[in-house]
């Protein structure tokens, strides 16, 4: 394996030790000391970014014949949902024009179909002497990932579309895009079919007639059956009859979660919850008493996203992700709704500041110590403390005193989602069965990660969120002037996410394509406007990569996203951009 990232020439390519043919050995250890990265005779796989592709291509061609190479392009539609110019567009166009490898695999869950890429295919065939085109489509319905709206109701086509023609268009669209079938809740399908069959005579859709044997009753086949069932039903009823039937089905539907909240007060505006200060600090909207639940003011329009308090138990099995364009607003909301007293926040702030000052003093003293003991290096006896001068011993004593002044930064468990104390605080008034509470997922942030984050020059809100088990993926916010510190923060958060130690990730839409971690639930904020169908499908695909038997949900705050997902595209911007950029002219 070799790697080409951010390369300006072939000399920037790096080989894994197993791929090295020429190298120097360490005379003491016998291991590889220095690799000749310019000799790639043993390289079988080159992993690169788009900007480095041409350099990587020429490198591989210098050791292999063109016909023996395969160019595998993962997610070639990244940035193609943007109509205006994007920095990647120039790279993509140059890559396509200068590419010399004819065996190309374009891999994406949202790749436009052949009919939409006629110009791209023609360009490819002209360049590579009538090259062959093969299309592979696959979809997996071995698990159900439930779509839920802002009112906590499961969403399926028959429950979403009151309009007869919209539902018919949706069914035809899903027949052509079966990957969306995994997001249709099996239980609701069965409820719908059973009810309709009691009202309408459809003998060909009786289970015994449709499924010839029990082996045919699979999740895939049931969902295909559902589409055919709707199509047949609509062909035998009028739009007015469907409208009445839809109304009845909506009335009969129950919420996905129906547990009662006895001590909740309601208000009208989120502005009464969040009162941001000009300096973007976190402030409490009101004082806290002994029973914070009874004093919590909640907004009915925000039901289902109180993820740091009363809705936390609904996040089960593993890490969840919340997509939003304003990550700081959602982060602030999570902190405020956790009801952390201002006194605790103030103490954490002071402890972080004191730790930072003491760590800087320790660094300075360590530097002085190293400078004064440089002549002792290699002399083990002299490096023992009792052989140091009084001045050096004084430095060591000062370092020890400062280390003892370092505070452990932590939160009480009642403020950490889904810990036992947190459940007792927020779930006591609900009739939630243990079978659900036992699977609610709690974060497990290790002390080393906490220390690293607290020592970084990042916004205080990010640090509090981390203590709660919540990470943030964003490089856009105004407060992020120190980019290197935030990049370090994100690497730590990514590592915690990969280890399933976080409870929740808050991310903006830039990270939809770049996240390959295992998520059990996702949220779409109301501010995700103008999302293309392809980007929605990519976002949905972040969830449900784990155990088949687990429960997965996707909770969408804006109904417009359901409409975009379920109906045929009026215009495919990604296909248009591919035809424009994947051109050798």
Question: Where does each model-flagged region fall?
Answer:
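Interdomain hinge/linker at the junction between the two RecA-like core domains of SF2 helicases
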Residues: 114-169
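Short, surface-exposed amphipathic charged segments that create phosphate/polyanion-binding patches used
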Residues: 14-25, 147-161, 569-573
């Amino acid at each position: 394996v070799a790697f080409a990232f951010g390369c300006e020439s072939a000399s920037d390519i790096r080989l894994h030790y197993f791929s090295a043919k020429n190298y120097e050995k360490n005379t003491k250890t016998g291991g590889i000391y220095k690799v000749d990265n310019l000799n790639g005779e043993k390289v079988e796989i080159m992993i690169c970014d788009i900007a480095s592709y041409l350099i990587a291509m020429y490198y591989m061609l210098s050791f292999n014949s063109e016909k023996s190479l395969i160019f595998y392009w993962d997610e070639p539609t990244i940035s193609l949902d943007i109509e205006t110019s994007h920095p990647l567009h120039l790279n993509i166009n140059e890559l396509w024009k200068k590419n010399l490898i004819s065996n190309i695999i374009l891999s994406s869950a949202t790749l436009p179909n052949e009919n939409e890429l006629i110009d791209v295919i023609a360009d490819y065939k002209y360049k590579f002497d009538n090259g062959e085109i093969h299309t592979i489509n696959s979809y997996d319905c071995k698990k159900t990932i439930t779509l839920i709206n802002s009112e906590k109701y499961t969403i399926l086509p028959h429950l979403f579309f009151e309009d007869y023609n919209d539902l018919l268009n949706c069914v035809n669209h899903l027949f052509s895009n079966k990957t969306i079938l995994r997001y249709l809740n099996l239980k609701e399908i069965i409820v719908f079919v059973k009810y309709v069959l009691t009202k309408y005579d459809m003998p060909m859709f009786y289970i015994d007639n449709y499924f010839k044997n029990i082996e045919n009753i699979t999740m895939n086949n049931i969902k295909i059956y559902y589409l055919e069932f709707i199509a047949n039903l609509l062909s035998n009823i009028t739009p007015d009859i469907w409208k009445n039937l839809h109304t009845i089905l909506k009335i009969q539907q129950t919420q996905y979660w129906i547990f009662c909240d006895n001590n909740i007060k309601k208000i009208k505006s989120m502005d009464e919850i969040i009162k941001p200060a000009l300096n973007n600090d976190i402030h409490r909207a009101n004082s806290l008493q002994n029973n914070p639940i009874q004093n919590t003011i909640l907004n009915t329009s925000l039901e289902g996203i109180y993820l740091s308090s009363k809705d936390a138990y609904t996040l089960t099995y593993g890490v969840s992700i919340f997509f939003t364009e304003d990550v700081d607003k959602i982060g602030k909301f999570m902190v405020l709704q956790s009801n952390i007293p201002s006194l605790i926040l103030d103490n954490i702030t002071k402890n972080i500041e004191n730790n930072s000052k003491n760590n800087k003093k320790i660094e300075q003293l360590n530097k002085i110590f190293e400078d004064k003991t440089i002549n002792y290096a290699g002399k083990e006896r002299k490096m023992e403390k009792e052989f140091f001068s009084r001045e050096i011993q004084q430095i060591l004593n000062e370092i020890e005193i400062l280390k003892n002044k370092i505070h452990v930064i932590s939160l009480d468990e009642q403020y950490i989602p889904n810990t036992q104390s947190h459940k007792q605080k927020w779930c006591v008034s609900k009739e939630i069965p243990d079978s659900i509470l036992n699977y609610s997922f709690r974060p497990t942030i290790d002390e080393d990660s906490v220390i690293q984050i607290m020592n970084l020059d990042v916004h205080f809100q990010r640090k509090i969120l981390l203590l709660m088990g919540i990470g943030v993926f964003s490089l856009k916010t105004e407060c992020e002037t120190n980019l290197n510190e935030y990049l370090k923060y994100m690497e730590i958060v990514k590592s915690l996410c990969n280890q399933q130690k976080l409870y929740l990730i808050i991310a903006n839409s830039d990270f939809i394509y770049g996240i390959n971690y295992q998520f059990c639930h996702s949220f779409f904020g109301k501010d995700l406007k103008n999302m293309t169908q392809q980007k929605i499908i990519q976002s949905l695909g972040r969830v449900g990569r784990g155990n088949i038997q687990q429960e997965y949900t996707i909770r969408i705050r804006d109904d417009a996203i359901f409409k975009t997902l379920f109906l045929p595209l009026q215009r495919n911007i990604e296909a248009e951009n591919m035809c424009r950029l994947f051109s050798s002219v």
